[in-house]
């Protein structure tokens, strides 16, 4: 033991007496390792006034993906200078192993640890942040009700914020800028700085950036932005980040009695977590139905209550919502919420999607004679009941109804179309179902006519102008039986996700236009309405252009390898 201590002391003496030139060489090598390729091309977010902003709306997210992939590849190559040849060129002996074992262990310091530098978020000054906040809560929040306004305004005024809060704020501003003619030029810069910061947080292994609700909210808003700009592939990647964070934080079982409520958590914080989960749930089902993908957030394992009534949420009244299974089967809803209705119709579409996928799997195993009638009829009965509740309990749809109410009405009709399509497919394997197939075709045609009327309402909507809201008045009598009542001063906006159910309807009509002349006529009428609906990406374009981009994206999915896609020439005819 004395010899070992003497040997350690000698080694420490050698380390302390290193030549200055060797230390300088080591520092230079460390500096070179930390100089990542591409740093010279990164924008300086702190010098925004002198920054040249992009002027084209056709910027491709794919370019960002390519450059990021090259960046990672080159970074990996430079951070691993040793090859197998260099490792094996020096013979390993017992003496060398003994010497290495006797050397003191020197822990890595931040100066010798290779890590990706955290990008700087773009900073806005003056009155622009306040204006973008106001634009967000006027134009985005009615359709994407994620945030508690008072809580956000409280922490947004603080000088020191969490990284995730900064990301959320910039995601909000990105969506607000997209829907503003005045600040539209800021959207690209805000979007890129926000996604870079979010990605850096996800890649951080230091533990200094714990995962939280604000990150999920930011990813969800970024997903909505990418969908509005028809970046469908990138939107799926972004929402996938939100899915993993939700699963990691177990937001699918926020109201599990066995887990309880964390100490110190208030109603508002818990409710924002619920809303983040359910918004991701809706997006998951929309992606799944649109592309025939498996559902990630399965309803069978969800133990989280539906969002509370919006007025209760904003007024901080701790009134809990129902569980999903209870709300779906309620004959009379406890309270009316367009957001909750959207969740329910998305769930029903997800069930039909699952039945169809299960049908194909069983067919592959030779189970061609399974009885699908019971599940089909049960789903049909629930769907009819929910459509009746929507028409009987909610006020008639008009221009003053708001984007969320219009969206859920479109979702309801598209749920009928999707359900009829799936049922017809499964009924073809059984004999004696011709009458039911005819009934499903008639129901789908009727629902398509409703969608056309709903699309016609969107032709009278502005892209940037929205409803000017007067403060809503509520009474105890109708607080839980009606949505907010606003005073209409301008025509309403289009829901950020409105194109998805409309495109599903158009796709159905296109694929069945040769089945019946009725479907061909409905397709022609719907496309005429699409020509009059303005695109938020480029107001000079219409939903015909949105549909072309939709089909261009769909051709890259596995589903389009088996089914025909819409011809662009036919759309523009």
From Swiss-Prot:
SMART domains: Fungal_trans
A molecular-function term among this protein's GO annotations: DNA-binding transcription factor activity, RNA polymerase II-specific
InterPro entries in the cross-refs: TF_fung (IPR050815), Transcription_factor_dom_fun (IPR007219)
Keyword Iron-sulfur appears in the UniProt entry: no
Xref: CDD domains: fungal_TF_MHR
Keywords: DNA-binding, Metal-binding, Nucleus, Transcription, Transcription regulation, Virulence, Zinc
Localization of this protein: Nucleus
PANTHER family reported for this sequence: C6 FINGER DOMAIN TRANSCRIPTION FACTOR DBAA-RELATED (PTHR47338:SF3), ZN(II)2CYS6 TRANSCRIPTION FACTOR (EUROFUNG)-RELATED (PTHR47338)
Job description of the protein: Transcription factor that regulates the expression of the gene cluster that mediates the biosynthesis of the mycotoxin ascochitine, an o-quinone methide that plays a possible protective role against other microbial competitors in nature and is considered to be important for pathogenicity of legume-associated Didymella species.
Protein name in UniProt: Ascochitine biosynthesis cluster transcriptional regulator
Natural source organism: Didymella fabae
Biological classification of the source: Eukaryota, Fungi, Dikarya, Ascomycota, Pezizomycotina
């Amino acid at each position: 033991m004395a010899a070992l201590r003497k040997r350690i002391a000698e080694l420490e003496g050698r380390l302390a007496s290193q030549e200055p030139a060797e230390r300088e060489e080591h520092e230079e090598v460390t500096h070179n390792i930390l100089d990542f390729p591409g740093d010279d091309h990164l924008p300086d977010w702190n010098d925004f006034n002198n920054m040249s902003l992009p002027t084209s709306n056709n910027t491709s997210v794919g370019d960002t993906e390519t450059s990021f992939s090259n960046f990672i590849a080159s970074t990996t190559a430079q951070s691993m200078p040793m090859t197998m040849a260099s490792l094996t060129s020096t013979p390993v002996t017992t003496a060398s192993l003994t010497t290495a074992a006797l050397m003191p262990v020197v822990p890595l310091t931040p100066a010798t640890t290779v890590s990706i530098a955290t990008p700087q978020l773009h900073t806005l000054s003056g009155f622009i942040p306040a204006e973008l906040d106001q634009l967000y809560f006027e134009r985005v929040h009615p359709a994407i009700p994620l945030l508690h306004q008072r809580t956000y305004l409280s922490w947004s005024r603080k000088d020191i914020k969490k990284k995730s809060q900064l990301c959320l704020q910039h995601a909000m501003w990105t969506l607000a800028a997209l829907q503003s003619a005045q600040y539209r030029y800021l959207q690209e810069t805000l979007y890129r700085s926000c996604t870079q910061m979010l990605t850096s947080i996800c890649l951080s292994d230091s533990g200094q950036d714990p995962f939280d609700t604000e990150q999920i909210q930011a990813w969800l808003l970024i997903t909505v932005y990418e969908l509005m700009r028809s970046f469908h592939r990138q939107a799926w990647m972004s929402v996938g980040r939100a899915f993993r964070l939700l699963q990691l934080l177990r937001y699918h079982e926020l109201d599990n009695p066995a887990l309880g409520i964390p100490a110190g958590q208030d109603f508002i914080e818990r409710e924002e977590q619920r809303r983040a989960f359910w918004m991701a749930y809706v997006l998951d089902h929309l992606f799944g139905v649109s592309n025939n993908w498996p559902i990630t957030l399965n309803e069978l394992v969800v133990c989280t209550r539906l969002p509370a009534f919006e007025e209760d949420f904003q007024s901080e009244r701790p009134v809990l919502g129902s569980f999903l299974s209870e709300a779906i089967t309620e004959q009379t809803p406890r309270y009316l919420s367009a957001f909750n209705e959207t969740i329910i119709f998305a769930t029903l579409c997800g069930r039909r999607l699952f039945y169809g996928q299960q049908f194909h799997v069983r067919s592959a195993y030779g189970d061609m004679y399974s009885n699908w009638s019971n599940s089909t009829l049960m789903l049909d009965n629930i769907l009819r009941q929910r459509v009746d509740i929507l028409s009987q309990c909610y006020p008639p749809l008009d221009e003053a109804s708001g984007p969320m109410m219009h969206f859920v009405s479109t979702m309801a009709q598209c749920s009928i179309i999707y359900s009829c399509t799936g049922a017809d497919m499964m009924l073809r394997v059984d004999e004696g179902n011709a009458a039911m197939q005819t009934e499903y075709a008639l129901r789908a045609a009727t629902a398509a006519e409703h969608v056309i009327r709903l699309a016609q309402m969107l032709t009278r909507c502005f892209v940037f102008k929205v409803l000017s809201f007067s403060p809503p008045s509520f009474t105890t009598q109708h607080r839980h039986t009606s949505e907010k009542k606003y005073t209409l001063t301008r025509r309403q906006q289009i829901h950020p996700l409105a194109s998805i159910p409309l495109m599903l309807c158009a796709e159905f009509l296109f694929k069945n236009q040769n089945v019946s002349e009725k479907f061909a006529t409905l397709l022609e009428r719907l496309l005429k309405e699409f020509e009059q609906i303005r695109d938020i990406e480029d107001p000079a374009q219409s939903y015909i252009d949105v549909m072309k981009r939709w089909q261009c994206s769909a051709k890259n999915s596995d589903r389009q390898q088996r089914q025909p896609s819409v011809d662009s020439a036919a759309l523009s005819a």
